[in-house]
Amino acid sequence: MRFDVNGFEIDKRQVSAEGADADPMAPLPLLVFSPGLYEVSVDTAISKTEGIKVLSDAPLANVPLDIQAEPTEKFIGVVQERVEDFLRGCATQRVLQPTGCPFGFSVQNRIDEPPVWSIVGQPTVQVVPNGASWAIPAADAVAHIEVDIRSLFDGSVREVSEDVPFTIDGTITVEPDGTASISIGGSANPAP
């Protein structure tokens, strides 16, 4: 929503007729002096672009410009950290199917004690533009479960220590106050 024109910061919500409800993806007409060379760029804590130069060389002429910002390394690092924190939180749940988490383990018998989860392979998170927000494309990760399973048939106990591959994805919405809301989803990968 914020961008620079020749070093002057503009917030789309301040110059758009819609104000705070401005659609980040909607075109924003601006009047400029002509002739003039203008450099438009984005440089915020979460996104950036290289400056794009545009020449306005005729009065009342429409000069279209489309810019797509990319996430900053710092923003990607924060998202990576939040995803890892989320998955570590999932691993603290001592159940076969951790609530709200992208991995789980199914058994046909009984378990003797609650399972112990760990994350042995964190995903490598990428952040990509997704319209007016950001997306986390699918990334592979691996959880590990240790649990004792008791057979309903003969009462024997089998110790299970198994890696559980899964995939995460997500969306990131930047609120008007500049905070980011990260929603993480995903699914268990089918067994080979």
Language-model regions, residue ranges each:
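Short loop/turn and low-complexity linker motifs enriched in small/turn-promoting residues
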Residues: 1-192
